[in-house]
Structure formats: C-alpha cells, structure tokens
Amino acid sequence: MVAVAILAAGRGTRMKSNLPKVLHPLGGRSLVERVLESCQLINPEKRLIIIGYQAEAVKQTLEPYEGIEFVEQKEQLGTGHAIIQLIPYLQNFQGDLLVLNGDVPLLRSESLHHLIEIHKTNQNSATILTAHLPHPKGYGRVFCDGNNLVTQIVEERDCTDAQRQNKRVNGGIYCFNWPQLAEVLPKLKPDNDQQEYYLTDVVKYLNSVMAVDVEDYLEISGINDRKQLATAYDILQNRIKDYWMRAGVTLIDPDSITIDDTVELQPDVIIEPQTHLRGQTVIGSGCRIGPGSLIENSKIGENVTVLYAVITDSEVESGCRIGPYAHLRGEAKIKASCRIGNFVEIKKSTVGEKSNVAHLSYLGDATLGDKVNVGAGTITANYDGVKKHPTVIGNNTKTGANSVLVAPVTIGNDVTIAAGSVINKDVPDDSLAIARERQKNISGWRMKTDD
C-alpha cells in the first residue's frame, strides 16, 4: 500500500504574488494539479494535501479531484513539521508514504513508479530521488556510501565549501516506510539557521536510506520564481512537441508553437508558426492549423484549414476553411465543408453544411441551414439591451451585402435578402425580401460651395 502526501502549504514569496505558489499555472494546469496527476498511475491508497497559505483557494482548485484529504499546517515550520501533521491521518496505516513537493511539476509517473519499486525491492526505510546536476546551486546535497546508501543530506545553506562541490542533489521526493518514519518524527529538532524541522534529518535515525537517480534531472526542477516557471514551461513544451512529432504531426518552427498536454492531435496534422493549442482541444487528421491561430477547448474535424483565427469552446466539422481573421466562440458549431472568412465573428451559432460566411459578418444566437450564403457585412442584431434573441435561416438562402437581421426573426428556405435590407419580420420560403428606401436621383443638383 502507498499513501501520497503533497507539500502545498507555502506561500512562495519569491513569486511576488498574492496567489499561492502551487496555484500558479503551467501549461493550463496549476503546479499542484500537475504533481497530483503525476501519481495517478500509482493508484495510492490515500492522497493527502498539506495546505497552509490560502488554504481555501488550494481546496477550491483541487475540488474536482475525488478522494483527497486536506491536512492543515497552520505554521510553516519546515518539511519535517509538515509531515508530522500527517500522524493523526495515518495512525493505522502500515504501508509506504510517497512525499512530493507541490512546486515540482515535471515529474513523470514512470520515475515515481521506479522509485517505489526500488524502495520495496530493497525493503528500505526510505528511498530518495536524487540527480546529478551540472549546476546544483540551490539544492541540498546527498552523500552516499559505496552501496548507494545515504549517509547524510545537507541543505545548501548549511553546506561547507567542500560539501558544495558534490553535484548529487536531493530532488525532494521521498518514499518512506511509514511506521518507521512515524516512530522517528518526534526526534526532529529545529537546530539549524532557519529554525525549521527538516525532513532530511530523519536519515540519521532510520536504518537504511537509499538514493535513486532520476533518469532526466530536469524532472526534479522546482519552481521558486517566475523565471523558473518560464523555464519549466519550456521543458514541458519540448516534451509535448517531441511526442507529437514522433506521432506523425508536423510542426513548422516548433519554437513558436505552444501545445497544452491536454490537446489531442491526429497524424498528418500540420501546425504552422505562431499557433497555440490549449485546453481540451482535439484536431483531426489532415488539418493545417495556422499560422497565427489560437484554438482552445475546441474540436476540429479532418482536413480543416485554419488561418489567423481564434477558436474557443467551439466545433468545426471536416473540410472547412476558417479565416483569415475569423473568431469562433461560445459553442459555435460549423458543419462540414463550410467557409468562414475574413473578419467574421460567430458566437453560439450553428452554420449548416456547405455554407459560406465569407466577409465582415457577425452571427450571434443564429441557426443556419445548409448551403446558405451570407453576404459581406451581414449582421444578426440579436441583443435588445435586455436579452438575446435567435435568428433562423433556412437552406439555400442568400443574404445580400450589408444586411441586418433583427432578431427574433426566421428566414425561410430558398430566400434572397436584397443588399442593404434591414429585416425585422419573418420571411417565408421562396421569397425575395427587400427592406430599404427606394433610391431617388435629383437631376442637376450641385453641392454648394464658397465660390
């Protein structure tokens, strides 16, 4: 049995933020969410989140995750003090405790699984995840004997000059035999410059503590300030983009592209420069996305082209062409083989198959049938200042340039709306609707001048 404890009580003053450090976002999810999800494959018996600074905000963020227990650390007196708070929650627990830091978001599940396996196989009192860093500044140093058993862990601020030459560092990830750890926790003393209870001090009280090196030292990267947050984002992006390129996705100028790890891409997708894919986005095979596009929480069908467009919370079916400079939002649904063109905004509307909205239009709260042609400058006037109203347009209908459809209004099938019309009444099938003043020409007229 394994229980997981995540240390998430600190403020993180170097972030210079009112937001708790563990709630800062990294690629669409908070740091602590990423840590929590890294241990999902372990299937722990218990998941304990140690909270302190802005505890309610942390609770609210993690509310969607089931089976979590929150442990409050009212005073932040070090990592050892944090683990002492677990004693009432694990009184009858006889398994192992995996301790994770809420600000170390790049850990892979495989690394944690390997750590636990080594711990169990060797029947260690504790097993520590370590790494050899080229530049170990800021990390505690781990000292081992010839059998990889830990003899000492020294925080950097307490290291001598000679000890600082050791490049094997403590990753802050531990697997403990809980009954043995619980027995020695009361022995911890705050006898250091920080007057804190260091969890690493338990090493001298436990029988066998082994160090295990992580395969990629970047996994243990901690986040203490905005620069480190940006560095972690780069590492995460490189992982994601490497995965998708190996899976058959073409990234043109990968450095200018960002992809959340919640995004799903099919083979033969081409992502052009300056494109950003976020949230629960799914993109079908054969699509060409970008350049200069943002797609968030949206589903894109096969063989869709998106050029300089913003698409959020929407769905685009196969064979569509979107952009340039189109904006789809608020549950817009574009059915197959449509063209949504220059400077078009579509919000909370459905556009039927093989329809065109090519230029300078706004469609809000509208339902369009199949093979509708929306002329340049057509607007649905859906808001009366109090509430929004629907517009319905039937199959094979055409709206002329600069038309205004004042909702609520229903336009039938096979209707033509004359250019420049303001339509505020329903139009039956097979009709021509004209709603504008008749043109009047005044012969011999001249504009007055000063001459």
UniProtKB/Swiss-Prot annotation:
Gene coding for it: glmU
- Residue sites binding Mg(2+) per the record: D103, N224
Cofactor, free-text remark: Binds 1 Mg(2+) ion per subunit.
Q: Which family does it belong to?
A: In the N-terminal section; belongs to the N-acetylglucosamine-1-phosphate uridyltransferase family.
Q: Which sites bind UDP-N-acetyl-alpha-D-glucosamine?
A: 7-10, 21, 73, 78-79, 140, 155, 170, 224, 329, 347, 362, 373
> Subunit structure, per the record?
Homotrimer.
Q: Which organism is it from?
A: Gloeothece citriformis (strain PCC 7424) (Cyanothece sp. (strain PCC 7424))
**Annotated catalytic residues:** H359 (proton acceptor)
Q: What's its job?
A: Catalyzes the last two sequential reactions in the de novo biosynthetic pathway for UDP-N-acetylglucosamine (UDP-GlcNAc). The C-terminal domain catalyzes the transfer of acetyl group from acetyl coenzyme A to glucosamine-1-phosphate (GlcN-1-P) to produce N-acetylglucosamine-1-phosphate (GlcNAc-1-P), which is converted into UDP-GlcNAc by the transfer of uridine 5-monophosphate (from uridine 5-triphosphate), a reaction catalyzed by the N-terminal domain.
Q: Provide the protein's localization.
A: Cytoplasm
Which Pfam families is this protein grouped with? Hexapep, NTP_transf_3
* The enzyme's E.C. designation: 2.7.7.23, 2.3.1.157
Cofactor(s) the protein needs: Mg(2+)
Give the region (Pyrophosphorylase) as residue ranges: 1-226
Keyword set for this entry?
Answer: Acyltransferase, Cell shape, Cell wall biogenesis/degradation, Cytoplasm, Magnesium, Metal-binding, Multifunctional enzyme, Nucleotidyltransferase, Peptidoglycan synthesis, Repeat, Transferase
What is this protein's name?
Answer: Bifunctional protein GlmU
